[in-house]
């Protein structure tokens, strides 16, 4: 499936197209299993969204985002919110019985908010 979708992404030099190509390239190698699901990160200009996905069944096991009502009142910059989202996803993963995950940065650089999510998840007790 990722190979089919990667053909739709043009060979243009836009940042989004380049990120999508990186994401498809990585997704060929990374897949979530029931024992070790995939922690997927999506980043927008203002918010971050995180899901834990079992790719064998195609189910989302847990999710968290900075868009949730409880995060709206959280004081801090976007990186601090991303760290808190990482801690939230770790709490929800533990409640679902998940201790280890495969980190899928979705073509984003491991820097800033993406790294803060990973650090927050580790602080929450999730093994990446």
Swiss-Prot record:
Keyword Ribonucleoprotein among UniProt keywords: yes
GO biological process: translation
GO cellular component: cytosolic large ribosomal subunit
Molecular function terms, GO-annotated: 5S rRNA binding; structural constituent of ribosome
Domain of life: Bacteria
Keyword vocabulary terms for this entry: Ribonucleoprotein, Ribosomal protein, RNA-binding, rRNA-binding
Pfam family, one: Ribosomal_L18p
PANTHER family the UniProt entry points to: 39S RIBOSOMAL PROTEIN L18, MITOCHONDRIAL (PTHR12899), LARGE RIBOSOMAL SUBUNIT PROTEIN UL18M (PTHR12899:SF3)
UniProt record similarity statement: Belongs to the universal ribosomal protein uL18 family.
Subunit structure: Part of the 50S ribosomal subunit; part of the 5S rRNA/L5/L18/L25 subcomplex. Contacts the 5S and 23S rRNAs.
Biological role stated in the UniProt entry: This is one of the proteins that bind and probably mediate the attachment of the 5S RNA into the large ribosomal subunit, where it forms part of the central protuberance.
Stated name of the protein: Large ribosomal subunit protein uL18
Organism: Acidothermus cellulolyticus (strain ATCC 43068 / DSM 8971 / 11B)
């Amino acid at each position: 499936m990722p190979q089919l979708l990667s053909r739709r992404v043009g060979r243009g030099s836009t940042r989004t197209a380049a990120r999508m190509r990186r994401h498809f390239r990585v997704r060929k190698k990374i897949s979530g299993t029931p024992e070790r699901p995939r922690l997927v990160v999506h980043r927008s200009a203002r918010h971050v969204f995180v899901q834990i996905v079992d790719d064998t069944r195609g189910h989302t096991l847990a999710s968290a985002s900075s868009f949730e009502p409880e995060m709206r009142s959280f004081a801090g910059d976007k990186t601090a919110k991303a760290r808190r989202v990482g801690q939230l996803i770790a709490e929800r993963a533990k409640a679902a019985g998940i201790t280890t995950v495969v980190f899928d940065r979705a073509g984003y650089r491991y820097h800033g908010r993406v790294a803060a999510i990973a650090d927050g998840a580790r602080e929450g007790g999730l093994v990446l």
